[in-house]
Amino acid sequence: IYTVAKMIPDLSSIPEVDGQLMAGDVLAELVHHPDRTTEEVIEEYLKDRRSDIPDKRVQEIIVQMRFIDSYATSFFREQAVRILVENGIRVTAYGTGWDQCEWSGSPYLDYRGKVLAPEILPSMNDAKIVLNTMTWFKAGAHDRIFNGMLAKAVVVTDDSTYLRREFTDGRELVMFRRQELGTLPERVFDLFGHLERAQEIADCGYAAARDGHTWKSRAEYLNCLLYTSPSPRD
């Protein structure tokens, strides 16, 4: 949250409504109903207040307000780490802003500062558990998930429709819903208390990522779409 503030545009460029008030209301709605998309909530907000705004202008405003995605993501990311730390689970965190959290002095937070993206993969190789919180899309996956699996760690992540379709909670990875963040410490403690089971999840996750979720497998999938699917002109 502390680094996202730099992304806020000039909200006075949205004369149709009070941009600052809209940003706060939309963010509050996303925090309370995290299954909703930013686009959906902004459109609903605008239509409720100004039914005369053309669809094209609604789309432009949605683009201007994209920073709300990052705020919502940052909120849940901080809450996920915080609830683990406050329950006595040691978390190693990388990136900016963690030292500005009011709870950053906890002995259970091992903050190692900002690192370049290529340095994260070797760190994953040393981890037993990789915690992921996704950006605000609802039907996809972040590459951290597959990188964590390929590092042979147990991946603990918030869910999406895609992840629920591709994997089974407790088999290839551990999934939680943002609305049930309070259960996260219990899920992690369960992994600590059943190390053989945790290793089975890590092994299944590695096999699943190796067999179907590498860059090579993605390239083959795209190649299949491009060269074997019927042409739109046919």
Regions found by a protein language model. Name each.
Residues 1-138, 142, 160-163:
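Nucleotide-sugar donor-binding catalytic core of glycosyltransferases
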Residues 96, 103-226:
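Catalytic binding pocket for nucleotide-activated donors in carbohydrate/polymer assembly enzymes
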Residues 227-234:
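Conserved small/polar residues in nucleotide/adenosyl-binding loops
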